[in-house]
UniProtKB/Swiss-Prot annotation:
D-ribulose 5-phosphate binds at R33, E34, D38, R146, R147, G148, H149, T150, E170. This is 3,4-dihydroxy-2-butanone 4-phosphate synthase. GO terms for biological process: riboflavin biosynthetic process. PANTHER family: 3,4-DIHYDROXY-2-BUTANONE 4-PHOSPHATE SYNTHASE, GTP CYCLOHYDROLASE II-RELATED. Keywords: Lyase, Magnesium, Manganese, Metal-binding, Riboflavin biosynthesis. Binds 2 divalent metal cations per subunit. Magnesium or manganese. It catalyses: D-ribulose 5-phosphate = (2S)-2-hydroxy-3-oxobutyl phosphate + formate + H(+). It comes from Chromobacterium violaceum (strain ATCC 12472 / DSM 30191 / JCM 1249 / CCUG 213 / NBRC 12614 / NCIMB 9131 / NCTC 9757 / MK).
Length: 210
């Protein structure tokens, strides 16, 4: 094991430790792809304060990343019959919890919706459509098949010992531009959050399949 391997392993395990403690991880994708950093949480540990953080510090578009099996079980059809998005992000129709919410917009309501969707006994009727939470279906092959935030969030949740479902939101600057580079670094240091890239996770999984 060389020094680079040690550093990579430390970064991955720091991210998993944060997720186990209910804290978000900052995950960046490739500079020649979206070149954005997302706050990612394991859906099982989501709390109202962490949802509020995502809404406050992110784009406001909070997504629930699911396996194909869970999306099929909940009968979540694609948002569009033909996916024309640049990177093939597999959005389904937006959702809301059928019970326990008001307008569905608040941090508490969105947390309730996500908890309803990931409950072990969740059924299609537990959700209404459309809503204010945006499910995305991860590829079955994870980051080995598609190097996206969606797949990374599901992989990280699974590796941390939770159900394979993640919550994410893109980090945004107060002026409405996307956080990148040093801005992301400053945010991570200010909030003491670990950082990881999708590429690093894919490399680690290739060497240490889990």
């Amino acid at each position: 094991m060389n020094a680079n391997t040690d550093i990579l392993s430390l970064r991955v395990h720091a991210a998993l430790d944060a997720l186990r403690r209910g804290l978000p991880v900052i995950v960046a994708d490739d500079a020649d792809r979206e070149n954005e950093a997302d706050l990612i949480l394991a859906a099982d540990t989501l709390t109202v304060p962490e949802m509020a953080r995502m809404i406050r510090d992110g784009s406001g578009i909070v997504c629930l990343c699911l396996t194909p099996e869970r999306a099929e079980r909940l009968q979540l059809p694609p948002m569009a019959a033909e996916n024309g998005s640049r990177y093939g992000t597999a959005f389904t129709v937006a959702i809301e919890a059928a019970q326990g919410v008001t307008t569905g917009v608040s941090a508490a309501d969105r947390t309730t919706t996500i908890r309803a969707a990931i409950h072990p006994d969740a059924k299609p009727g537990d959700l209404v459509r459309p809503g204010h939470v945006y499910p995305i279906v991860a590829r079955a092959g994870g980051v080995r098949e598609r190097r996206g935030h969606t797949e990374a969030s599901v992989e990280l949740a699974r590796l941390a010992g939770f159900s394979p479902a993640g919550v994410l939101c893109e980090l945004m600057n107060p002026d409405g531009t996307m956080m990148r580079g040093q801005q992301v670094q400053d945010y991570a240091e200010r909030h003491d959050l670990p950082q990881l890239s999708v590429a690093e996770l894919a490399e680690w999984l290739q060497r240490e399949p889990a």
